[in-house]
Amino acid sequence: AMEIYSEPWFRTRLDYYLRERHPQLQYRAQLLDRRSAVAADLYRRTCDAGGSAECALRLADRSLFRGLLFSKFDTIDLILANDFPDIPEDQRRTVARALLTPCEPIFAGYALGDDFASRPEFRQLKAELRLGIRQWIDDNGPPGYEAKLRHRVRTRKMRNGEPRKTNRNK
């Protein structure tokens, strides 16, 4: 018996994928509706034309996830995991999501696509993101949580309830 994959099944898969890999897109109902309908239709038509369920699912998935295979969020999360070990693992996704907007100008300098992570420019993008994230954290503190280090620095600036003058302002 051949599996029959319906529109709600494709929608659930895409919704989960967006939550995990593209949290900034997860509530785009129009994207979920359109992609899941097209994938379900493509799956059904391929099976009706005599294609195997495996082939039909592969075609439907290609349609469902087109343009979403490269994830800015995953890239930032990877950099945080590798280069910013002070950020607790349980808070890394929150920090990565908060860094999407400040990192957008860096991403804008590249022609991103589904195969981008396998292209040579990916290494350059990661290097630029590392520098950009380091600069952003140096200027603003880590987004999404109260870092212990930042808290200690702030506490040291207080004397007798009065802020001490610092050379932090450039």
Residue ranges with predicted function:
Residues 1-170:
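C-terminal alpha-helical interaction appendages
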